[in-house]
Amino acid sequence: MPRSLKKGPFVDDHLQKKVDAQNEAGTHNVIRTWSRRSVVTPDFLGHTFAVHDGRKHTPVFVTESMVGHKLGEFAPTRTFKGHEKDDRKGRRR
């Protein structure tokens, strides 16, 4: 069930303050964050966030198509190494 429109998108306050400070200063430094739950808003455009994936911070450059999605969607938490290939040599008929 989507969030109510009257509430607006959720963004952690500390993250919004960092983005606003960089927008006022005109800089685009990398912002480290653990807030995967924050929604990407239009004022995030052009910024790079280092989103924590549970192990390391993954750099995420925000583009226009990302607006409305959550930061955590762009930093996968699981690495898929592929299924194990069948060993035909050890198989009996």
From Swiss-Prot:
Gene3D superfamilies: 30s Ribosomal Protein S19, Chain A
Biased composition (Basic and acidic residues): 9-21, 81-93
Region Disordered, annotated ranges: 1-24, 73-93
GO biological process, one term: translation
SUPFAM superfamilies the UniProt entry points to: Ribosomal protein S19
Ribonucleoprotein recorded as keyword: yes
Disulfide-bonded cysteines: none
Signal peptide span: none
Keyword Transmembrane found: no
UniProt keyword annotations, A-Z: Ribonucleoprotein, Ribosomal protein, RNA-binding, rRNA-binding
A single Gene Ontology CC term: small ribosomal subunit
Any GO MF annotation of the entry: rRNA binding
Family the entry assigns: Belongs to the universal ribosomal protein uS19 family.
HAMAP family recorded: Ribosomal_uS19
Role noted for this protein: Protein S19 forms a complex with S13 that binds strongly to the 16S ribosomal RNA.
Official protein name in the record: Small ribosomal subunit protein uS19
Species name: Kineococcus radiotolerans (strain ATCC BAA-149 / DSM 14245 / SRS30216)
